[in-house]
């Protein structure tokens, strides 16, 4: 069963890669009508973070109960100033914007434990547009790098939806993907630990900047600081 799911995810990856070349640099951020937790506004007691960049602020809600390691790592790094001055070193339009590497090369960064930590997957967290997720180089290799999904809304075709259903994604998840857009090919490969609830337009603005042949922005996009707080 696992091999079949992996094969289907590979097919979704191919289709999504083709669709990435068919985008416009304008995005209509429609309201998503879904009971999935990533589309709820932060409530009292939730941990939130404001990623302050030189292009604007991106506000995310974090999910420590479902991804405790990833959240602890991100929050501790943020509070220690680890991400201050770090660039978005990898920007791919209609896919992701990636940061968290102090070296700015895509090869650097470490966890707060100075070792890679385990993946944390959940049926409740997925790579919808606006998802905050851990970058990795394979299974259980999470360190400090993270990305935000910036796939175009309405980008989930009937073909992709059918493949997702065949692989076992719940109907509610598929419906949410169809409304919000996203990158389902990243599910169960990367740890989702947060979701943008305000400032998604800033993430899209970053995704539209001009890049070189290595997907690096030609003009630096920088995280000035990340402020973490708990909703009262």
Regions found by a protein language model. Name each.
Residues 1-23:
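Secretory targeting signatures
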Residues 20-232:
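Cyclophilin-like peptidyl-prolyl cis-trans isomerases
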